[in-house]
Amino acid sequence: MGRDIIADIITSIRNADMDRKRAVRIASTNITENIVKILLREGFIENVRKHKETKKDFLVLTLRHRRNRKRSYRNFLNLKRISRPGLRIYSNYQRIPRILGGMGIVIISTSRGIMTDREARLERIGGEVLCYIW
């Protein structure tokens, strides 16, 4: 039985954000690197470093936290895994869901690589809906 790498990184980021950790370490694969590039480009994380330990590559993500008047920190990231190994969810470009009226993003795996919902609509291409981020 294989591991769900995308669910692992989503869970790691969500847990680190709820625990107010500044950095989180995830395994480095092509899929995780592409998803992290999207998170960095969209401003959900501050920084990414590649780290190598005994033949294994890791990505160290620096999370972004927002300060609030009442509490010192507010959970900033909300991530939800949509398509999973037991139930794949596919969508054409016209039916890609909009999260919070376009405020959030949908990460989609297409034949041209992993991209956001906006990029997929511009290129008029559909694919597997991996996760929602808002």
Swiss-Prot record:
Q: Where is it located?
A: Plastid, Chloroplast
Q: Which Pfam families match?
A: Ribosomal_S8
Q: Per UniProt, what is one GO molecular function of this protein?
A: structural constituent of ribosome
- Biological process annotations from GO: translation
InterPro entries the UniProt entry points to? Ribosomal_uS8, Ribosomal_uS8_CS, Ribosomal_uS8_sf
Q: Can you supply one Gene Ontology CC term for this chain's record?
A: chloroplast
Q: What does this protein do?
A: One of the primary rRNA binding proteins, it binds directly to 16S rRNA central domain where it helps coordinate assembly of the platform of the 30S subunit.
Q: HAMAP family from the xrefs?
A: Ribosomal_uS8_B
Its recorded name reads Small ribosomal subunit protein uS8c
